[in-house]
């Protein structure tokens, strides 16, 4: 099974997670959130492990009774691939973390081609 981590479980991330769960050879090993929002219900209902974006946010989640499995770096270490669904201009900041861990990544947010070095658009690539 390919271990998939979703960094940014919001508008895009929750849809990516749904698509991953439909694959026979993939499993969600965790999702990252900056704060507990209404979108967390889907992650909790699906029993996705929840990771806080930073150590300072862990107590915020725990204050709402949400069990936290670690922080972003912890998820990056256990995942085979990270789908970065963070808002535009934030995802590129995670590139060094992914490279350092040797974890492959796909940016599914609003990143431009130049900093990432690759782009994909289903309209033009298929």
Q: Model segments located where?
A:
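N-terminal Rossmann-like NAD(P) cofactor-binding subdomain of oxidoreductases
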Residues: 1-126
């Amino acid at each position: 099974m390919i271990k998939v981590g979703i960094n940014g479980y919001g508008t895009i991330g929750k849809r990516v997670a749904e698509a991953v769960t439909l694959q026979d050879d993939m499993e969600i090993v965790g999702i990252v959130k900056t704060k507990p929002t209404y979108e967390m219900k889907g992650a909790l209902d699906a029993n996705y492990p929840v990771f806080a974006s930073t150590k300072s946010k862990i107590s915020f989640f725990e204050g709402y009774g949400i069990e936290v499995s670690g922080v972003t770096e912890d998820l990056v270490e256990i995942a085979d691939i990270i789908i970065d669904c963070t808002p535009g201009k934030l995802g590129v900041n995670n590139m060094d973390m992914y490279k350092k861990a040797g974890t492959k990544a796909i940016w599914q947010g609003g990143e431009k081609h130049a900093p990432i070095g690759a782009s994909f658009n289903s309209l033009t690539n298929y």
